[in-house]
Amino acid sequence: AMRPVFEQQRPVFVHADELAQIRHALGLAERFELRLVIVGGADAWRMPELLRQRGVPVIVAGVHELPRRRDDDVDTPFRLPARLAQAGVQYCISRVGGERSASNERNLPYEAATAAAHGLAPEEALKAISLHAARILGADDRLGSLQPGRLASFIVTDGDPLETTTRIERL
C-alpha cells in the first residue's frame, strides 16, 4: 500500500499550518525522498522560496480564516494565494476538514474572489479552484480545464463567477 509513496508515484499530503510544522514536513520528505503536498499552509508565505525550490505545492485550506498571530495583518490569509503565486509556488484553494466542510464547498468561489480582491489575478483565482487543484492531484490530463477529451462539469452564470451577486443559470 505504501510502495507508490516511497517510489514517488504518489504524493504524501501533510496538514501543516505553522512554520515549524511545514519545516518538519519538508525535512521528512527530504529524508525519506517523498513527494510532498502541504495542506493548510497558513505560514507558507513565510518560506515561499524553499517551497518553490523543492517543488512542494500548497493546498491553501481556507482563505476565509483569521490570522494565526496577533501581530499578523488582518488580511494575511486573504493574501496567501497571491503571495504563493508571485513566488512561483504551485498552489490551489480548497476547504479542508471540519464537520461541515462538504457544505462549505459551495463557498469556494467566494474564497477565490477574496484572494482576487487581495492581489491574485482573477483568472488565476479561477484556476486556483480548478486547474491548479487538478494539477496538484496529478489529474490535470483529464480534469481542471475545458478541453476536448477531458471530463468536465461546468456552470453557466449570469455574470462574473467571482462576484457574490452572480447567479448560476445552468449546470
Outline where the language-model segments fall:
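Metal-coordinating catalytic core of metallo-dependent amide/deamination hydrolases
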Residues: A1-G27, R31, H64
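Solvent-exposed alpha-helices and their adjacent loops that cap or buttress functional pockets
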Residues: P4-E7, Q147-P148, T164
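His/Asp/Glu-enriched, well-ordered alpha-helical/loop segment
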Residues: P11, E49-P57, A61-E65, R70-D158
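Catalytic beta/alpha-barrel core
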Residues: F13-D17, L34-D43, V63-R69
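Short acidic loop-to-helix transition motifs that present clustered carboxylates
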Residues: L19-Q21, A42-R46, L131-A134
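Conserved strand-to-helix beginnings and helix N-cap segments that scaffold or border functional pockets
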Residues: L26, E105-P109, I168
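Short, Lys/Arg- and Gly-enriched loop/turn segments at beta-strand edges
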Residues: L162-I168
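Short aromatic-centered micro-motifs
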Residues: L171
